[in-house]
Amino acid sequence: MSEKYPGPLVVEGKLSDAERMKLESNYLRGTIAEDLNDGLTGGFKGDNFLLIRFHGMYQQDDRDIRAERAAQKLEPRHAMLLRCRLPGGVITTTQWQAIDKFAADNTIYGSIRLTNRQTFQFHGILKKNVKPVHQMLHSVGLDALATANDMNRNVLCTSNPYESELHAEAYEWAKKISEHLLPRTRAYAEIWLDQEKVATTDEEPILGQTYLPRKFKTTVVIPPQNDIDLHANDMNFVAIAENGKLVGFNLLVGGGLSIEHGNKKTYARTASEFGYLPLEHTLAVAEAVVTTQRDWGNRTDRKNAKTKYTLERVGLETFKAEVERRAGITFEPIRPYEFTGRGDRIGWVKGIDDKWHLTLFIENGRILDYPGRPLKTGLLEIAKIHQGEFRITANQNLIIASVPESQKAKIEKLARDHGLMNAVSAQRENSMACVSFPTCPLAMAEAERFLPSFTDKVEAILEKHGIPDEHIVMRVTGCPNGCGRAMLAEIGLVGKAPGRYNLHLGGNRIGSRIPRMYQENITEPDIQASLDELIGRWAKEREAGEGFGDFTVRAGIIRPVLDPARDFWE
């Protein structure tokens, strides 16, 4: 594949302005501390607008009222999104109670948003509450370091495996990888936690003074569940077990879904297999992949800076050989592994030690008290009595983990009383959207606010064609950055403009194939008409057990994407 097209190891040329910003930031300090005291604006100015991302925050505004405020000669209502670092999505009930209180008392929207990267976000934090949120997190053993911008982001880990013992081991590795790849700068502690400035020079032995060329995403995945969507990520450790014990990992590198509309130098790409490594080499290999991307990634063009482009430019074998050289190992051949699904198993599942896990479906991950469904209050009440932990899944759901038999009935009653166990269709369980409007500055079309009613319509189409219990993995993302992971869905909608989407078809249920654009810039009625026709054909013509995405490929409705660098846009 990529070996046919070898390119330079380092891209020469004028560095992007982001590289200047990082270099001049004094290891991510900038003038954030001074900016915090500027009461004339609700936002951060100059480089600080981007630098706060390294501290886990994005500056946003409420786009529903942007025009109204402009007419009143007011600046946009600036507020921050904060994303917590939570490897593997595991959070204690004490931590949950603290974040519940902060959301209620100190955010505009009052909600907790579970993300498909197994963490939570607060939306609508005013500038005066920015420092307090970091201090609140620190007080319960959490932080927001490196959850955005050019670093290794929150490390994912399969959250509901069939073998609980394996989860415990894999989760420990997710934590170790996260800690190992964290930035070493003291900027976070100095600015947010008021820790003293130390008169030593900061060093970043792994990330370097200008950090990574672009965001970098890592997973630890336990087959046969691909719930964390490994092909959306730069670096993936696939757990290999013998007799129920973790012995090593298969490494897959170079996945990523973000594109830019009309820019044919960008494409979604699945991750490539590098080989198998025994457990003891895990951190060395993780570091080697990151430092190779640090040194070879494109720092002249951020649209082509991710690992997937580096891999295609230099060639897979060249990149792999460099990782082996830096880690001091030779990869063994890939060990057999198979994925059979990626949805969460909603409801009760029995684990080891006679403990139970209850997976709750949270539509689009938005935890709020809705009329007749006080989800947020319900989870708070469960957190007050539950002796285990919560786990956030990569499908934006929540697991009440390690429930003893004696507590099962009580927790189930709380969940039912607060609308947390209402029956939903298989289709709704397998549908997901990013946040998009009103808070995301990149949003081109609705996603989270659009999906529930759109799912109703897809459910009606399934019913019409006599397959109401079937499901299609469906995802909506408000812009081509792809946070909703539409580029690994059977039906992927990518926002193009208000009320308009590109429709992608031909992904599969296990998330190992990129869907191709079927129709461009179309409205919701157009999408429904296309799906009505195609789902009707699927219902009549499918083979036994054949998913919708596989059917669209077999029936010749869509050509599969086989080599994205070459054929994604064809």
From Swiss-Prot:
What keywords would UniProt list here? 4Fe-4S, Amino-acid biosynthesis, Cysteine biosynthesis, Heme, Iron, Iron-sulfur, Metal-binding, NADP, Oxidoreductase
Under catalytic activity, the entry for this protein gives: hydrogen sulfide + 3 NADP(+) + 3 H2O = sulfite + 3 NADPH + 4 H(+)
Summarize where [4Fe-4S] cluster binds, as residue positions.
Answer: 434, 440, 479, 483
Which pathway does it operate in?
Sulfur metabolism; hydrogen sulfide biosynthesis; hydrogen sulfide from sulfite (NADPH route): step 1/1
Cofactor requirements of the protein: siroheme; [4Fe-4S] cluster
Q: Where is siroheme bound in this sequence?
A: 483
Gene Ontology CC entries for this record: sulfite reductase complex (NADPH)
Q: Which GO terms describe its molecular function?
A: 4 iron, 4 sulfur cluster binding; heme binding; metal ion binding; NADP binding; sulfite reductase (ferredoxin) activity; sulfite reductase (NADPH) activity
A single Gene Ontology biological process assigned to it is: hydrogen sulfide biosynthetic process
UniProt entry tagged with the keyword Cytoplasm: no
Q: Which InterPro entries match?
A: CysI, NiRdtase/SiRdtase_haem-b_fer, Nit/Sulf_reduc_fer-like_dom_sf, NO2/SO3_Rdtase_4Fe4S_dom, NO2/SO3_Rdtase_4Fe4S_prot, NO2/SO3_Rdtase_4Fe4S_sf, NO2/SO3_Rdtase_FeS/sirohaem_BS
Query: What binding details are noted for the cofactor?
Result: Binds 1 siroheme per subunit.
Statement: the UniProt record of this protein carries the keyword NADP = yes
What protein family does this chain belong to?
A: Belongs to the nitrite and sulfite reductase 4Fe-4S domain family.
Q: Describe its assembly.
A: Alpha(8)-beta(8). The alpha component is a flavoprotein, the beta component is a hemoprotein.
Task: Report the protein's function.
Answer: Component of the sulfite reductase complex that catalyzes the 6-electron reduction of sulfite to sulfide. This is one of several activities required for the biosynthesis of L-cysteine from sulfate.
**Name listed for the protein in its UniProt record:** Sulfite reductase [NADPH] hemoprotein beta-component
Which source organism does the UniProt entry give? Salmonella typhi
